[in-house]
A protein has these predicted regions:
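Short, conserved "post-DEAD/DEAH" coupling segment immediately C-terminal to helicase motif II
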Residues: 144-146
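Alpha-helix N-cap/helix-start and coil->helix boundary motif
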Residues: 168-169, 189
Length: 216
């Protein structure tokens, strides 16, 4: 999956101008208003189906500023530095970039996020795991222990996981059991053509197939 250097707000504006998954909006509208009642989520589907935009739309529901401000922070480790794209409520980790030292690097990243959330007023946050289908087997074996650590009523902070993946069959049952699964289908060529037609009629800049892929 490609993730373009585009702001969260631009992703959401594009999605709201032409929603290629109105059936998913019906489903996500039923999610709780309070993040403390939100379960972990698995958003899965083929590449180019719009999983990231759906995930951002869900996260936006719990943002205090509608994801208008995105920032970056760096996690410094013995194995190298890792840049995180963050908002007021969520933290993005591209699992495919963790490499062969993913187990140790993930540990450092996770507790960096915990430290940030711990000093915030509401002490709550969402970790968005992108390209989860590329997770190393050693990390996958212990991933559930991180998920359950701060996602129960007695925890001093609240962390919700949103997993974006192209497959789901490899994910351990424990993770699936504690998550709500949202299946995203790849948009048809007809939907793509409609998007391009609407966009080109309302803009002086001609949109292409690549532009369609960029914002889903």
């Amino acid at each position: 999956m490609k993730y373009y250097e585009t702001s969260f707000e631009e992703y959401l504006q594009s999605k709201n101008s032409f929603d290629i998954h109105p059936e998913i909006k019906i489903q996500t509208n039923k999610l709780p208003e309070n993040i403390n009642q939100l379960n972990n989520l698995i958003v899965y589907g083929p590449s180019g189906s719009g999983k990231y935009s759906v995930a951002l739309d869900i996260i936006n529901k719990y943002s205090h500023n509608e994801l208008k401000y995105d920032k970056h922070t760096t996690v410094y480790t013995d194995k190298g530095n890792f840049n995180l794209k963050i908002s007021d409520i969520h933290y993005e980790v591209d699992i495919s970039l963790l490499g062969c030292n993913s187990k140790q690097l993930w540990h450092e990243i996770f507790f960096k996020i915990v430290d940030i959330i711990s000093i915030q007023k509401d002490k709550e946050g969402i970790i968005l795991c992108k390209n989860f289908q590329n997770i190393h087997s050693e990390l996958l074996d212990i991933f559930y222990s991180y998920i359950q650590q701060y996602n129960h009523s007695q925890a001093n902070i609240k962390i919700v996981f949103i997993i974006i993946t192209e497959q789901i069959s490899f994910i351990p049952f424990q993770i699936i059991q504690t998550s709500q699964v949202i299946n995203i289908k790849k948009p048809s060529q007809k939907i793509c053509n409609t998007y391009l037609e609407i966009s080109n009629n309302s803009s002086n800049t001609k949109k292409t197939q690549e532009d369609f892929s960029k914002y889903i």
